[in-house]
Amino acid sequence: MTAHLKQQPPTSAPASLPRRSRAARLRRVVLRSLGGLLVLLLAAFAVGWAVTPGVGDAEQRVAARLAAFGGTPSTGQVPERVAAALLATEDSRFGSHPGIDWRGALRAPLGVVVGRDLGGSTIQQQLARVLYEDGAIDPGARARSVVLAVKLDRAWRDEQLLRMYLDAVYFGHGFYGVQAAAEGYFGLPPAELGWAQATVLVGLVQAPSAYDPLAHPELAAARQAHVLDRLVDVGTLTRADAGAIAAEPWHLTAG
């Protein structure tokens, strides 16, 4: 007599498989979307590269700007304290990015949330807007400045870019360029500025009228404190150094 083997019910698929399948489909959609976005961005960058001007004339543009506004070209080495304060505040990864800093761009919205200025635009982008976009900040100008920033980074050495930036910036009170600003505010050449003076000067870059040390000393001191905080953040100064510098007089001569 043949024994009847008990048939086992068919094994059902794990309940998690449909979930995994949905997750896999979602990943594919996301990856395809990101891939498509990357292609569009690269295409837009290629078009931007073709339609924006070359930047071999950047130094001539700086010289023309200084001549138009009565500024003075800087001489000698880039002032060490001014450069350190500027880079800590405006572009702490200068020299290690190709003219655009995606980390900085991602930090900028975070700064709005936490109530601190964490940067965003690089030195090259800011210089591009001043020299080639007449300071415009509309979306088109910002997009072009990204392409121009990469061109500037490829065409010029870091020291040249810093010098052009410091010569092109407006520091308020009719002072165009770091040479005129240092002599106008403090009666000193840029290389002889102390930390207190250099940090006040760099604080003017983003809003020279708002942080005017003559008209708004309290706001200028608050901005100086931010510059000092950034110097501490990047390791140039200790917290004790920053506190001592914040207490130093500025010795303003303009007014």
PLM regions and their residue ranges:
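Juxtamembrane regions of bacterial inner-membrane/periplasmic proteins
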Residues: 1-255
